[in-house]
Swiss-Prot record:
It comes from Bos taurus (Bovine). Gene3D superfamilies: 2.40.50.40. GO terms for biological process: antimicrobial humoral immune response mediated by antimicrobial peptide; calcium ion transport; cell-cell signaling; cellular response to fibroblast growth factor stimulus; cellular response to interleukin-1; cellular response to tumor necrosis factor; cellular response to type II interferon; cellular response to virus. Chemoattractant for blood monocytes, memory T-helper cells and eosinophils. Causes the release of histamine from basophils and activates eosinophils. May activate several chemokine receptors including CCR1, CCR3, CCR4 and CCR5. May also be an agonist of the G protein-coupled receptor GPR75. Together with GPR75, may play a role in neuron survival through activation of a downstream signaling pathway involving the PI3, Akt and MAP kinases. By activating GPR75 may also play a role in insulin secretion by islet cells. This is C-C motif chemokine 5. Coiled coil: none annotated. InterPro entries: Chemokine_b/g/d, Chemokine_CC_CS, Chemokine_IL8-like_dom, Interleukin_8-like_sf. GO terms for molecular function: CCR chemokine receptor binding; CCR1 chemokine receptor binding; CCR5 chemokine receptor binding; chemoattractant activity; chemokine activity; chemokine receptor antagonist activity; phosphatidylinositol-4,5-bisphosphate phospholipase C activity; phospholipase activator activity. GO terms for cellular component: cytoplasm; extracellular space.
Amino acid sequence: MKVSATAFAVLLMAAALCAPASASPYASDTTPCCFAYISRPLPRTHVQEYFYTSSKCSMAAVVFITRKNRQVCANPEKKWVREYINALELS
């Protein structure tokens, strides 16, 4: 019994560490915050809209919302992120 509980705890920790860079709620507030950025550009055709995270968040981020309604965190200082934002503003 102890072995299965330990194995479950290890799997739970591994799942938490392997989570993609996505937005998640900050404490009890519904403002999404990011704790990691996506490492490579998203396909531009997958992005529908975006928003900036709140100043309450520990790190600034742009959250892109994909066609499949996924929220993906990106570094607002990256060139591709700024280009996507400009393209979305013009469309």
